[in-house]
Amino acid sequence: MLSFFGGNMKKVILAGVVIAAAISAVSCGGKNVAKVANKDKPLVFYNRQPSDPVSGEIDMESMNWNGSTYYVGFDAAGGGAVQGQLIKDFLASADPAVIDRNGDGILGYVLCVGDVGHNDSRARTEGIRRALDTWNGSPDPTNVKDGSVNVGGKTLKVVELEGKAMTGTDGSTWNANAATDAMSGWATKFADQIDMVVSNNDGMAMGCLQASNYPAGVPIFGYDANADAIEAIGAGRLTGTVSQNVDAQATATLQVLRNLLDGLTGSDVYTQGISTSDRYGNKISAPVDYVNSTKALLAQNSGVNSSNWEQYKAGNRDTGIKQTNAETKKVLLTVYNSADNFLSSSYVPALNYYAPLLNIDLTIVQGDGQNESSCIDKFTNLGNYDAYAINMVKTNSGRDYTDRLKY
């Protein structure tokens, strides 16, 4: 009897020691098992900056959600200027007799607008119109004036024949199919008055080229440097585009999260691995600037045309980013529209390439580009993740996501 109790007592005591040790590990252990509330976890908005869709004012309530909230995108205003300069440079060296198709002394163009409530679209529209002297103080598709521009040493009057927001039948913006339909209508309506086509992005530009009656040889400009657009430049179908350095953006999104998850604070969050080498020896090759007032990291833009398109061919990844030995962390990332050409063909592949190098286990959920609920309904099981990256359907929906992180 004594032997029986003695043996079992040892087991009980041993079990108690194990349980006590486990409790100690949970309550006093290292940061790996420390419970962090969702509201305190790193949050990065990317590609679609939280802002008012009418005024363009940055939504600082969302940006100040916590001390670990940032935005990663590109220099929208600078990008609009780059696209405008790309167009001006092309026209300056062009033959006016070729550009002015009907010889009326007028350069007529049509404009594909992505989303009148999106800061990037607004900036690109402004850059285009400033370059062509048709800017009238507003990015509104209908608020425009006549201008003038140098074409091969000759001054031509410039008329925006029509500007239109490309909204699909499902309500989605930046819609390539809508651009195809619009171009078909424009070609019929304006005929040889159309001397140039300009688009807020490559997806819509490529959509225009899909129109069966697209006027052959008419120059067309896009924006994003998507793979199909780059190939179209090489084939002579697209005249030019703008690279917003998608690899720099995707890597910066992941790098900021990595820095925050590694416990970095202050300026180290937006410089380590971005403008200076991080502890793993990584540094993004392309320039990325930090704007303190809006907590935004912005990649710089560059023009792409027939003289340099081969530099931007798909598959050229940033060699400055190498495999790290950092602890693996889980990140939940939303994509506002699974059908968005830039995100699906360029941004998401870049994320999927760099995330494993930074030891980030990325879970991507995608929306329909129309309803915020298509993303938010998948923004779930938040306690299973160490950080979040958000790409909203509407730029003023930041609070819809942060409300989910309160609990």
What name fits each language-model region?
Residues 79-83, 119-159, 178, 182, ...:
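Short, solvent-exposed amphipathic alpha-helices that sit
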Residues 32-39, 128, 149-152, 157-231, ...:
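Hydrophobic alpha-helical
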Residues 2-12:
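Positively charged n-region of N-terminal signal peptides that target proteins for export
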